[in-house]
């Protein structure tokens, strides 16, 4: 899990720069397809090293999603509906975590290979569906076309943009706000099923759903209320 988080964190700002320059619809679709494909391939892994490198690839592909998806939402929603739309979108993260806990149940009934295969196939199918349902906001595309030449001249350099970002206090406050709960949050989500199983003698098939549902439910409520 650590290699995924390190690469995800390193790639996130790079993914943001990519999302500013290419079609975000295809970044979302491609990101979902690749990380679902990687999930599927994990079912064929024979050793730790194969799982390790597949998780590393997943970190790259997942990092491309959030900047593209959130900026698309911002283009389609203005005013009060924007916060709610982002909140509703983020509920998917926690619903997915809750459902993901049942992966332990599926693994107990069938095998962990089957679990990776099923979740991967569902994700790849959904990415194909998004090809037909997801699109860029045409108003933004039209607004950018006439001033494309001027926009290239006015666009700040990479170092200029980073300098402007790092000199903004709001950026550091938000960064700390996300970092502080993430430190215990990721540790809890990763190890709580194992803790329940080994310390409380709860079968992993039950420990998985119990640990993910409890955290995901409160997070689900929080992002909805925050969006409102």
List where the protein language model places each region:
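Short hydrophobic/alpha-helical segments at membrane-entry points of transmembrane helices
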Residues: 47-55, 173-174
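Membrane-interface helix termini in secondary transporters
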Residues: 16-17, 21, 105, 227-228
